[in-house]
Amino acid sequence: MGRACGGRRRAAETEDIYAGAGPPARHAHEVRRRSGRAAAAAGTGAPVRKRGDEMSKKATEFQRKAMSWMYRGKENFKPLNTGWIDGNVACVREWVANIFFYRRGGTTLMIDAGYNYDRLEEKMGWLGIDPGEIRHIFITHQDTDHVGAVEADSPGLFRNAALYIGETEDRYLTGAARRRVIYRLYALPQVTVDQEKVLLRDGQVLDIGGIRVECFLVPGHTWGHMVYLIDDRYLFTGDTLWLGADGGYSFISSLAEDNRLALRSLAALEEKLRVRRLKPLFITGHTGWTDDFSFAFAHRDRLCSPFRRRVHDPAAPYDAYDESDDTESGAKCGFLEKVRVHR
């Protein structure tokens, strides 16, 4: 387990944001929690969920079919193929989403857990990463394309890993809040996770095997979305930042809990990095990476709309759910290119 070595108090405005997202989290950082059937078995009173109630496999199949049809030709999604960004960061492609791994010394951290995806272990093998060695998984947010591999109906590749997740985001997992999409018109089924959890706060800093992980709360896409700054060099942004051909935007508008809040959060993130003169690699969940600070925040005051071609990248595949070009030979052939800048 990681060792906490610092942190900052949340601003009052940020605290107020969560008033409507469910009751306050009861457990402080470093308190491990379980949910679903495991919690019920432990006598916590949490509801016992039947296997048929769990959404991961159903949601994965829905996205593969329906969303593939919806987003074809939109030039929105541009995931990285499986491979290495540099000597420390690797990724696995799962259709439109990426899972990331950060390796330094003898420690490997995993950032997000993707879909409930049948080929994950195979593709990790392309990178020389054994699922059994993963002990720490940092979750940016609880959507099923970011937690699928650790949901209750997953194959259980990471049973030995602890999940690090924002204490506010955990409200979705406990059922205290419901995740809403399509401009908050539709409530998604509850995600069920039975693994140990470490609840994180804004500004928390962890030391895990000599690796420094700093947590930034960036609510908007979800109420408790976190981004993770690792060793002051790599910023894993989840679904906060969308890289188009002409720069970064706030993430897809139709999928946010609160778009105005998402814009404010992105602006606040830029300011934090600028004040500290940090220029990390910006590594996104669906649209690749860039090391260009100005490019990353070029349109931080604008939302990405999947129905407007002005937020697009002509280099994006026609159908990002078609991963036929994601191959083992490609994963072992050099480093993955960053997003090309189109001025």
What are these regions (language model features)?
Residues 56-60, 64-67:
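Eukaryotic low-complexity, intrinsically disordered regulatory regions enriched
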Residues 57, 315-343:
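C-terminal regulatory/interaction regions
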Residues 1-49:
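Compositionally biased, low-complexity flexible segments
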Residues 109-112, 137-138, 215-217:
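Short catalytic-loop micro-motif centered on adjacent basic/acidic residues
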Residues 117-119, 125-204, 301-310, 317-318:
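Active-site HxH/HxHxD metal-binding segment of metal-dependent hydrolases
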Residues 68-73, 78-80, 167-219, 223-295, 306:
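Metallo-beta-lactamase
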Residues 74-127, 227-238, 242-244:
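Conserved beta-strand hairpin/beta-sheet module of binuclear metal-dependent hydrolase folds
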